[in-house]
Amino acid sequence: FTDAQNSKCPHFYTVEDNALTQDWSEKLKEIGGSAFANPPYSRSSYHEKQAVTGVRHIMNHALAMREKGGRYVFLLKVATSETWWCEEADHICFIRGRVGFDVPQWFVPADENQVPTGAFFAGAIVVFDKTWNGKAIDYIQRSELEQIGKTFVEQAKWLVSRGVA
């Protein structure tokens, strides 16, 4: 779920790849690891009668992939009243504090009325993993989550500097 310009991971699906037609579990077996997505919250769109976006389609595909194995981690806005909200997830960790997002590099306002802003809303980390044995529901402070993220980035940089990653 990327335009490739804003990718944060070395392996990703673009709209041309259509993640909703891919076998994520096979890809995870190939690369060894877990999947992360911050999916688009846009309405469903289709290409040749096949969904390419839409959170409900994405959550349905995540559930299907969960059954095939693997860990699928999503950063989602909290929208428990929406039909796509993932009550079937194995773990939901609500983030205390609003989450902000950067405007994509490619975004060009159509006019002066279209002011670019990052979204700020309640978020949750949602995990689909049938081997999950932790709590079903939990909470984390945004500041704690940010610190964990910074630690992972530093570890990744260290591994790269050692030629390991």
Language-model-derived ranges and their functions:
Residues F1-A165:
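Class I S-adenosyl-L-methionine-dependent methyltransferase catalytic core
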